[in-house]
């Protein structure tokens, strides 16, 4: 390829013109790994960085960076990117396994070492870590639980678009992915908690601690949106951060 030459002539080639990308609806070219597989598969072979630090080399997730996109409750209770998405090697292996018929996938995956015996194949942007893989029956995760290798099956099961028993999206009460309530933002204490602070005077998820009247006209006595929601908030220690 002459990618650098094209770019220097002010005619850059879009990566997704060859590498398929579900996020853009780009079909790519047959025989090429999709965009996410190509990127993660390559870097996993050359980057020897552990845990979430590997992700932060490219993604804006560093705790001391300018964006700090991972500012929800999970890092506050000691979790990093790899607890849900796997190590860089595991993340890449799942993508490569989904395209195992491509020669480049076979070449890239053979050198990768993972802590999981067999990483299940997955499609990028469509199959992501399943929340209920750790929060089984919407309960507190068991010690040592991990979201790795429990991918959702369909786009409609993604946290950002998933709906509860009443048709409400999860994010309507819990906030956006990676900034779940109560979120911590270094650029403003409750900058990501505007909605619960406005309606409930608390940074906790909407309706937490049996504050259903934030939305409902009367006290609710059962878990209508999902099981196990009428209970005290578990991780109150994060409120002191």
Where are the predicted features?
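Core catalytic machinery and nucleic-acid-binding channels of phosphodiester-processing enzymes
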Residues: 2-7, 12, 16
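Inter-heme linker and motif-flanking segments adjacent to c-type heme-binding CXXCH motifs
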Residues: 2-4, 21-241
